[in-house]
């Protein structure tokens, strides 16, 4: 994974025990670990190596799997109960994922909101099947009460302060790239609820989700997304795209589905000086839309993107 975040957004808007103890060390020690692993292997860089210079928290917390389910034919959803009370994250960030007996460390975006962690000490992940050892473990061996460790990292997030200027969000997702954007969407909904109930807090603008997948079976978290659209019809909207649909689209999804890729026109229609764009998906997709936005004179500090391999 490679993360590219505009500097102006970084401030706000934007065996387990053995590994955990090592990663509590200094950043230089962390970089030494990743460099050492590269020297020992000629394989292409993994998550730790790609993100060696990305900001991470110091806390490495034990966590227990308290829920596991199939989110789609190719994606497993995990719910983790996090032990360390000092563990926290911002909407959009990811975790280093340490598994006993698995030497490779995973990197998975959190798809739940920070509020869920605050209230119930839980986070959610959604992991696509792959030959990568951590993903294989999740799909083939992970069960209820499996124990892992997690550490938060990443500079791709939305974390406005109550006094920050109101912003609209356009969230552009491809495939499993929905994960950090769902976290941001859920956080935006929590901010809307807080403002409605207390009459104070951050004033959230509108949120538009543009989400593309192969077919409706691979559109992750459809029900959660549509529930938020229905809860906040004046604030949250979505356009769900499918590129290789072969079966009939169900009546409940039809109003939200477009067959074909997300287009430049859809993006341009939502450009304004109050709008921030968050993009997450395969590298060609993130490159295309970030360049399209720049060519449309959207300020670079209003464009945030994250690439997943």
Swiss-Prot record:
Q: What keywords are annotated for this sequence in UniProt? A: NAD, Oxidoreductase, Signal
- Give the EC number(s) listed in the UniProt record: 1.-.-.-
The taxonomy runs: Eukaryota, Metazoa, Chordata, Craniata, Vertebrata
What is its EC class?
oxidoreductase
Its recorded name reads Oxidoreductase NAD-binding domain-containing protein 1
**Where's the FAD-binding FR-type domain?**
47-161
Q: Name one GO molecular function term.
A: oxidoreductase activity
Name of the gene encoding the protein in the UniProt record: OXNAD1
UniProt keyword annotation of Transit peptide present: no
Native species: Bos taurus (Bovine)
- The positions making up the signal sequence are 1-14
According to the lineage, what is the superkingdom?
Eukaryota
Residues recorded as binding NAD(+), renumbered to this chain, are 175-180
């Amino acid at each position: 994974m490679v993360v590219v975040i505009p500097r102006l957004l970084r401030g706000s808007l934007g065996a387990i025990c053995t590994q955990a103890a090592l990663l509590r060390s200094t950043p230089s020690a962390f970089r030494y670990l990743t460099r050492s692993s590269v020297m020992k292997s000629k394989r292409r860089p993994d998550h730790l190596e790609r993100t060696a210079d990305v900001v991470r928290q110091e806390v490495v917390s034990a966590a227990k799997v308290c829920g596991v389910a199939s989110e789609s034919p190719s994606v497993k959803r995990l719910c983790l109960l996090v032990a360390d009370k000092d563990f926290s994250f911002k909407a959009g960030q990811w975790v280093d994922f340490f598994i006993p007996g698995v030497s490779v460390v995973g990197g998975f975006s959190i798809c739940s909101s920070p509020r869920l962690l605050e209230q119930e000490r839980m986070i959610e992940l959604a992991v696509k099947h792959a030959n990568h050892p951590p993903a294989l473990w999740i799909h083939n061996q992970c069960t209820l009460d499996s124990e892992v460790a997690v550490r938060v990292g990443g500079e791709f997030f939305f974390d406005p302060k109550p006094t920050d200027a109101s912003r609209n969000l356009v969230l552009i997702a491809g495939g499993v790239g929905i994960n950090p954007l769902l976290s941001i969407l859920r956080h935006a909904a929590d901010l809307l609820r807080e403002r409605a109930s207390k009459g104070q807090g951050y004033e959230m603008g509108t949120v538009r989700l543009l989400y593309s997948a192969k077919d409706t079976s691979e559109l992750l978290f459809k029900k959660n997304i549509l529930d938020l659209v229905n809860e906040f019809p004046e604030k949250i909207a979505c356009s769900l795209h499918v590129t290789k649909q072969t079966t009939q689209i169900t009546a409940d999804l039809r109003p939200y589905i477009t067959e074909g890729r997300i287009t430049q026109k859809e993006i341009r229609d939502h450009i304004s000086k109050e709008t921030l764009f968050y993009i997450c998906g395969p590298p060609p997709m993130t490159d295309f839309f970030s360049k399209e936005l720049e060519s449309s004179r959207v300020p670079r500090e209003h464009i945030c993107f994250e690439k997943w391999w």
